[in-house]
Amino acid sequence: MLHYAVVFFVIALIAALFGFGGIAASAVSIGKILFIVFAILAVASFLFGLIKKR
């Protein structure tokens, strides 16, 4: 459990550096594009799973 706490603390520090450093503003557009791509892939995977069961 302590291992997970340390890992999430390090991730939070890295996110804070990006957020306070101004890098986050330029990464927003990349994040939006990646969200759309992975949402489409998730829906496609779900549909292919339903089709394959039949």
Swiss-Prot record:
UniProt-listed InterPro entries: DUF1328
Family: Belongs to the UPF0391 family.
The protein's name: UPF0391 membrane protein Rfer_1875
Source domain of life: Bacteria
Cellular component annotations (GO), alphabetically ordered: plasma membrane
Keywords: Cell membrane, Membrane, Transmembrane, Transmembrane helix
Keyword hit for Ribonucleoprotein: no
Cellular localisation: Cell membrane
Transmembrane segments: 5-25, 30-50
Membrane topology of this protein: Multi-pass membrane protein
